[in-house]
């Protein structure tokens, strides 16, 4: 499905309908001119001051759009265009598959990108020996979790990865797969392997059923697709999640601004604000239950011997925290959502 259609159907449509209505538009020729010209951030003729924020299409798409919305990055994307100019910042957004992003970030063509850690690892594994990656991971975004796993037919005799040595393995991650089997075979990375690694861009899970492969190396999220294809995982190559990456060559001051905004949104998604009253005598124990990110906020109540406590708590732990607070004498426990934040 086209990105703009998914965007219009999402819960983010209110952002598009209001603040995005007057966003500047970029023609197809302007797009090609922008990405092909020598990269100069001081170029006053650039429609985005030559600053590009790179984001993604695919399985990370909707969470990325929500993250940009929460960071007040206002844009409008025209149908069939891979680029959108931001209304309220001198930034251009480029929408491309996650696999392409580390290359553009690493070569310094763009400053920031959102992609999977697996894609960064695949990019880095392709670099010549001794070459330093131009991609720097700066934040785990906490969504898009998956594993790059070695998989084989459920009904077969193979139960561990080393049994695939010398056989056919199909994958979209050829560099990581080659590095993995190089370790299994005990040879230097880049040397000829007895294992035959073949590249397939999509539908990797069908390779075994079609007789093309004895095993595959592919991403697994829930595992449902793997099971439906009659496969089982026997080893893990890389564990992945969505990450914010930047070019090591960037000097753009907006990088820190955007990073701070994204960090604030991620914090707001992960935490809630827990407020409760408790006798001062129980404050020490309660503070250990709700230590906050730095320390809890404590306010004396008019009722003598009582205090009010406010503390940030991880959302996934809040039910247990509330139970523990009740046990130590807390009352009037409230949990409030955090819309956004800036934390140290």
Regions found by a protein language model. Name each.
Residues 1-95, 107, 114-147, 156-344:
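Small-molecule-sensing regulatory modules
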Residues 102, 111:
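Extended cationic-aromatic binding surfaces that line active-site or macromolecule-binding grooves
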């Amino acid at each position: 499905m086209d990105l703009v259609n998914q965007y219009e159907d999402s819960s983010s449509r209110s952002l598009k309908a209001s603040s995005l209505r007057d966003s500047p538009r970029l023609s197809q020729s302007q797009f090609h001119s922008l990405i092909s010209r020598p990269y100069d951030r001081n170029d006053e003729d650039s429609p985005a001051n030559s600053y590009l924020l790179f984001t993604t299409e695919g399985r990370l798409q909707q969470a990325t759009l929500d993250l940009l919305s929460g960071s007040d990055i206002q844009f409008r994307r025209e149908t069939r265009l891979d680029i959108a100019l931001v209304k309220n910042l001198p930034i251009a957004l480029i929408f491309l598959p996650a696999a392409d992003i580390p290359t553009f970030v690493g070569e310094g063509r763009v400053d920031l990108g959102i992609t999977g850690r697996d894609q960064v690892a695949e990019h880095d594994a392709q670099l010549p020996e001794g070459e330093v990656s131009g991609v720097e991971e700066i934040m785990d975004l906490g969504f898009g979790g998956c594993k790059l796993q070695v998989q084989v037919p459920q009904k077969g005799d193979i139960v561990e990865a080393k049994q695939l040595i010398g056989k056919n393995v199909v994958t979209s991650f050829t560099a990581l797969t080659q590095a993995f089997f190089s370790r299994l075979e005990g040879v230097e990375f880049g040397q000829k392997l007895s294992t035959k690694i073949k590249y397939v861009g999509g539908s990797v899970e069908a390779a075994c059923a079609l007789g093309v492969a004895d095993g595959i190396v592919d991403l697994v999220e829930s595992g449902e697709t793997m099971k439906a294809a009659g496969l089982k995982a026997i080893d893990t190559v890389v564990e992945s999640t969505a990450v914010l990456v930047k070019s090591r060559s960037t000097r753009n001051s907006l990088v820190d601004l955007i990073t701070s905004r994204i960090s604030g949104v991620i914090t707001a998604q992960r935490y809630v604000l827990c407020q409760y009253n408790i006798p001062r005598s129980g404050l020490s124990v309660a503070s250990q239950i709700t230590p906050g990110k730095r320390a809890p906020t404590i306010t004396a109540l008019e009722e003598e011997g009582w205090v009010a406590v406010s503390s940030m708590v991880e959302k996934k732990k809040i039910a247990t925290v509330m139970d523990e607070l009740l046990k130590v004498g807390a009352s009037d426990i409230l949990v409030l959502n955090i819309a956004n934040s800036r934390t140290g």
